[in-house]
């Protein structure tokens, strides 16, 4: 029973922690809107009609605060993820996960207090909630550490199957959270925040009561298989393989001056080409997926849907992703492994297949002539969400190390950088075609298809770099 608890608990933690985040997406905006509206109308208390808050000055104020909050919330994770990833390798995963929960709990509490007592605090003070995310690093660090823990917990033959299941957790939250948040907001606007805080407290309690995430947890659960390393894509230097740790990307003793740093980066790419390609794929995947942020606007603009009804796009995307990562990919992975197919062949095959699905889906979205075709294209795009866990399986095998916290921390950093650069790029492409009161031509979806085409090429390159090792890794 204890063994099964160790196996299941990381998935429960990830499901709950991500639910606490998605549950607050809409309520947080509404709380900020309410506080800003009271400030603009100079009302200290009493009921306020939501329609009165839809004036341009109030909405501009809300957009400014929400936009800056999103930016500030990403800074702690970006600045601290490598530190916490390395610390997780040294101190165990549980301590870092607990820190993430504490910091996020304080951030939720700060926003709640600021908006609840809007007659005392200016709404701009919600931006200070981002400071609490330096305690643990927030959602980004939690995702990196829990992924590293699952990768450490399971042996190579079954690792990717469980990474698929882990990837399904946030997609399940995306399906359930809108309806749950709506029901809670109907009772009280501040109730979703209280429920989210309770969920985070449950996560802390689960971490405190269990041994999950301790440094020795993987060896206790996996047994002798935890000492195995996959002879997959042996691009690491001999010294890094012998020591059981991944060679650092940049030597801190030698990284002095821009030319020396550039030289070290080039040497690392030459020494660890597979890791470099994996990180590049994570960057490109996040960059391409940035176009998904515009699907609601595109459905409303091109096909005349009311914006409030475009939430069906979230349901289509998440439903496809849940079916893919929870059912199709794990079953395919287990079936192929039982037939003796090497794990690395399965992983790279999943990267290749998922990328093809995404290319076809985004081309279909670009060429969609009806709202039904567009919705179907996004449902199909959800089936391509197996790309990320498949890449995680390749990365875990290629890292040649038991301490994967820093490896997956860098992975999340690349994904975040992809999000940050993809947003402005896709926004600019989305604006093409609007001249002369026209509608967008949807070139952002074509760009996404082209980027995923590049990922297909990189998947072939991964195969070329390690075909001999892959055929005999298991």
From Swiss-Prot:
InterPro entries in the record: MFS, MFS_trans_sf
Glycosylation sites: 238
UniProt GO molecular function: transmembrane transporter activity
TM region(s), chain numbering: 7-27, 64-84, 101-121, 131-151, 162-182, 189-209, 276-296, 315-335, 346-366, 374-394, 406-426, 445-465
Topological category with respect to the lipid bilayer: Multi-pass membrane protein
Listed GO CC annotations: plasma membrane
Residue ranges with Polar residues bias: 222-244
Family annotation (Gene3D superfamilies): MFS general substrate transporter like domains
UniProt-listed Pfam families: MFS_1
Keyword Cytoplasm attached: no
Entry keyword set: Cell membrane, Glycoprotein, Membrane, Transmembrane, Transmembrane helix, Transport
UniProt subcellular location: Cell membrane
Region (Disordered): 220-252
Protein family (similarity comment): Belongs to the major facilitator superfamily.
Other information: Trichothecenes are sesquiterpenoid toxins that act by inhibiting protein biosynthesis.
Function, in words: MFS transporter; part of the satratoxin SC3 cluster involved in the biosynthesis of satratoxins, trichothecene mycotoxins that are associated with human food poisonings. Satratoxins are suggested to be made by products of multiple gene clusters (SC1, SC2 and SC3) that encode 21 proteins in all, including polyketide synthases, acetyltransferases, and other enzymes expected to modify the trichothecene skeleton. SC1 encodes 10 proteins, SAT1 to SAT10.
Protein name in UniProt: MFS transporter SAT21
Gene behind this protein: SAT21
């Amino acid at each position: 029973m204890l063994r099964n608890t160790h196996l299941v608990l990381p998935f429960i933690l990830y499901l709950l922690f991500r639910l606490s985040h998605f549950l607050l997406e809409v309520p947080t905006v509404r709380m900020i809107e309410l506080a800003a509206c009271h400030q603009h109308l100079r009302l200290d208390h009493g009921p306020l009609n939501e329609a009165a808050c839809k004036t341009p000055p109030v909405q501009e104020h809300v957009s400014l605060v929400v936009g800056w909050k999103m930016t500030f919330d990403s800074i702690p994770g970006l600045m601290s993820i490598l530190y916490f990833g390395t610390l997780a390798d040294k101190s165990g995963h549980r301590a870092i996960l607990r820190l993430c929960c504490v910091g996020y709990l304080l951030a939720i509490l700060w926003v709640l207090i600021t908006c609840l007592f809007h007659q005392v605090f200016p709404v701009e003070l919600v931006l200070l909630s981002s400071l609490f995310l330096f305690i643990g690093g927030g959602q980004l660090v939690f995702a990196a550490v829990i992924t590293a823990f699952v990768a450490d917990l399971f042996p190579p033959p079954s690792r990717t199957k469980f990474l698929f299941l882990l990837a399904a957790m946030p997609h399940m939250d995306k399906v359930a959270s809108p309806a749950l948040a709506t029901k809670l907001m109907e009772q009280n606007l501040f109730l979703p925040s209280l429920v989210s805080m309770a969920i985070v407290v449950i996560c802390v309690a689960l971490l405190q009561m269990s041994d999950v995430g301790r440094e020795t947890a993987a060896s206790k659960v996996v047994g002798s298989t935890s000492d195995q390393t996959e002879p997959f894509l042996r691009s690491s230097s001999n010294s890094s393989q012998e020591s059981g740790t991944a060679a650092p990307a940049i030597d801190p003793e030698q990284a002095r001056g821009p030319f020396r740093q550039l030289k070290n980066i080039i040497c690392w790419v030459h020494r660890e080409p597979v890791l470099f390609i994996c990180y590049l794929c994570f960057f490109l995947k996040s960059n391409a997926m940035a176009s998904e942020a515009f699907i609601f606007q595109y459905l409303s603009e091109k096909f005349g849907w009311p914006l409030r009804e475009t939430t069906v796009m979230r349901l289509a995307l998440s439903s496809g992703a849940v079916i893919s990562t929870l059912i199709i990919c794990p079953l395919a992975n287990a079936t192929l492994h039982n037939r003796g197919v090497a794990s690395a062949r399965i992983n790279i095959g999943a990267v290749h297949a998922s990328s093809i699905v995404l290319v076809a889906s985004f081309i279909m979205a670009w060429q969609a002539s009806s709202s039904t075709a567009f919705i179907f294209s996004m449902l199909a795009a959800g089936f391509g969400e197996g790309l990320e866990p498949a890449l995680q399986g390749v990365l875990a095998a290629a890292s040649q190390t038991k301490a994967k916290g820093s490896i997956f921390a860098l992975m999340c950093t690349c994904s975040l950088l992809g999000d940050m650069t993809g947003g402005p790029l896709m926004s600019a492409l989305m604006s093409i075609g609007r001249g002369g009161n026209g509608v967008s031509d949807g070139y952002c979806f074509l760009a996404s298809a082209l980027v995923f085409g590049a990922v297909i090429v990189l998947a072939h390159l991964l195969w070329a770099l390690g075909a001999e090792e892959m055929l005999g890794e298991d």
